[in-house]
From Swiss-Prot:
BP term (GO), one: heme biosynthetic process
Pathway annotation from the record: Porphyrin-containing compound metabolism; protoheme biosynthesis; protoheme from protoporphyrin-IX: step 1/1
Subcellular location: Cytoplasm
Protein source organism: Burkholderia orbicola (strain MC0-3)
Protein's recorded name: Ferrochelatase
Reactions this protein catalyses: heme b + 2 H(+) = protoporphyrin IX + Fe(2+)
GO CC list: cytoplasm
PROSITE patterns noted in UniProt: FERROCHELATASE (PS00534)
Function recorded in the entry: Catalyzes the ferrous insertion into protoporphyrin IX.
Residues noted as binding Fe cation in the record, renumbered to the chain: 214, 295
Domain of life (superkingdom): Bacteria
Keyword Cytoplasm: yes
Xref: HAMAP family: Ferrochelatase (MF_00323)
Length: 354
């Protein structure tokens, strides 16, 4: 095995600490070519699609990418921001905010972000850390709930990059924070602030709040993945924080792909059923997405909205994701700080002179 080239070891190295925020990824542009390139990497991950790769790659290259590339590009174009992809824009802002928060609290750490698929990739970010003298790294996935298809594959990519290093840094990982009080508080604050500006649903009249999480195949639950249970845990804690019952608030799962059974209830059919049942207002919030992206802006804000209205609903609200909310940045900083304990994150103080 060939190892990456590295500078000579030195006792005068920076011995710095790096915090790497890791998100899923996004195409570089809302074009069919860029989207196909992104989807090819994403859907080729055996953690994401757990069927024999020899069969899957034929289907992927001959049917799925040609069909989905152009259709998905149109959807990305509908949500693209002047600065770029929403997921990348919001993740960059979160990174800047966490860096500023830690620095203002006396932490001497580098903070950067990487994407599991697309750019900037995890290997590049870890290489940049090494070049800056980082010897300890905290991997912080932006997925509050653990899943093999998100958290585990992000760690896989990081460990693959480490396997190519001769002089490896010390590494810690944040597995999940689905029940972390600061995260739950940030979610509740996001909902409350939205309602303060746009009015609270009339739950007594039958209005609903839907908590929509990204779906995964049901068989992953049967195989031991804790994702479903952690989504339900987050949902229950958020309902309690908002003072809502399971009649007023429902946990659902979105973004089903293929014909296999996924975690249920599905988001879009649930919203249509609400409309058909006479529910006048439905608010949808996505607690598992820490930054707005195609799945929240387009799928929820457009497709799911249309399902609800087509079913007879009158008013639909998509509550924005945490993005750069101050409570969320504070929660991120708190979770990071907890996982940095024991590492020399602050400059040594000189001994007092007697």
């Amino acid at each position: 095995m060939r190892f990456d080239l590295e500078p000579p070891s030195s006792v005068a190295a920076a011995h710095r600490i790096g915090v790497l925020l890791i998100n899923l990824g996004t195409p570089d542009a809302p074009t069919p070519r860029a989207v196909r390139r992104y989807l090819a990497e994403f859907l080729s991950d055996p953690r994401v699609v757990e069927i024999p790769q020899a069969v899957w790659q034929v289907l992927l290259r001959t049917l799925i990418l040609p069909l989905r590339g152009r259709a998905s590009a149109k959807k990305y174009a509908a949500v693209w921001m002047p600065e770029g992809s929403p997921l990348r824009v919001y993740t960059e802002r979160q990174t800047d905010s966490v860096r500023h928060l830690l620095t203002s609290n006396g932490y001497h750490v580098m903070v950067d972000y990487a994407m599991r698929y697309g750019s900037p990739n995890i290997s590049h970010a870890l290489t940049q850390f090494k070049r800056a003298g980082v010897e300890r790294v905290l991997l912080m996935p932006m997925y509050p709930q653990y899943s093999a298809s998100t958290t585990a594959t992000a760690f896989d990519a990081a460990f693959d990059a480490l396997a190519r290093m001769r002089n490896q840094p010390e590494v810690r990982t944040v597995r999940h924070y689905a029940d972390h009080p600061a995260y739950i508080h940030a979610l509740a604050e996001q909902v409350r602030q939205y309602w303060a500006q746009h009015g609270r649903p009339d739950f007594a009249a039958g209005d609903k709040l839907v908590l929509s999480f990204h779906g995964v195949p049901k068989r992953t639950l049967d195989l031991g993945d804790p994702y479903h249970d952690q989504c339900q845990q987050t949902g229950a804690l958020l309902m309690a924080a908002l003072g809502l019952s399971t009649t007023e608030c429902r946990v659902t799962f979105q973004s089903r792909f293929g014909k296999a059974e996924w975690l249920q209830p599905y988001t879009a059919p649930t919203l249509r059923e609400f409309g058909e049942a006479g529910v006048r207002r439905a608010d949808v919030f996505c607690p598992g997405f820490t930054a707005d992206c195609l799945e929240t802006i387009e799928e929820i804000g457009m497709e799911v909205r249309d399902e609800f209205l087509a079913g007879g609903g009158k008013t639909f609200h998509r509550i924005p994701c945490l993005n750069g909310a101050s409570a969320w940045i504070g929660a991120l900083g708190e979770i990071v700080a907890e996982n940095l304990q024991g590492w020399p994150v602050k400059a040594a103080q000189p001994e007092p002179v007697n």
